[in-house]
Amino acid sequence: MNTIEGKLTLTGKEKIAIINARFNHIITDRLVEGAKDAFMRHGGDEKNLSLILVPGAYEIPFALDLAIKSSKFDAICCVGAIIRGSTPHFDYVAAETAKGIAQTTLKYGIPVSFGVLTTENIEQAIERAGSKAGNKGFEAMSSVIEMLNLYKNLKA
């Protein structure tokens, strides 16, 4: 059987954007640092890494659509933190953000990763932004690098 997969390496020429939702910035700043760390560790050139800031997670799909249409990026890593409160707002924002990112990814067919935390409380978010559960920003960037290389392999 022939196995096709993407490697977890960059040549230094790939242009990748991180779209970061500023809301809950104490968490999302750590996700961005994790994503940047993964980009650099896997061979990225910092001049080819861009940070796109949006107010909150709900705005990520729109910024993603604009970033892809700009043709400036080979892949995009989306990060944010949606933390449940006492109203149903969490459910709507989490669902629409996930759906919007997925639809935009499929619409344009370029590698995009989903590093948006959806947690029950701030403690869970902190755990996933660099403490007990690792850094989901690092994981999201690693995923998009692997998918970018898979995309190149399958497109060739």
Curated annotation (Swiss-Prot):
It catalyses: (2S)-2-hydroxy-3-oxobutyl phosphate + 5-amino-6-(D-ribitylamino)uracil = 6,7-dimethyl-8-(1-D-ribityl)lumazine + phosphate + 2 H2O + H(+). (2S)-2-hydroxy-3-oxobutyl phosphate binds at S86, T87, R128. SUPFAM superfamilies: Lumazine synthase. The active site is at H89. The keyword Transferase applies. InterPro entries: LS (IPR034964), LS/RS (IPR002180), LS/RS_sf (IPR036467). One of its GO terms (biological process) is riboflavin biosynthetic process. Keywords: Riboflavin biosynthesis, Transferase. One of its GO terms (molecular function) is 6,7-dimethyl-8-ribityllumazine synthase activity. 5-amino-6-(D-ribitylamino)uracil binds at F23, A57, Y58, E59, A81, I82, I83, F114. Its EC number is 2.5.1.78. Pathway: Cofactor biosynthesis; riboflavin biosynthesis; riboflavin from 2-hydroxy-3-oxobutyl phosphate and 5-amino-6-(D-ribitylamino)uracil: step 1/2. GO terms for cellular component: cytosol; riboflavin synthase complex. It holds the Pfam family DMRL_synthase. Belongs to the DMRL synthase family. Catalyzes the formation of 6,7-dimethyl-8-ribityllumazine by condensation of 5-amino-6-(D-ribitylamino)uracil with 3,4-dihydroxy-2-butanone 4-phosphate. This is the penultimate step in the biosynthesis of riboflavin. HAMAP family: Lumazine_synth. NCBIfam families: lumazine-synth (TIGR00114). This is 6,7-dimethyl-8-ribityllumazine synthase. The gene is ribH.
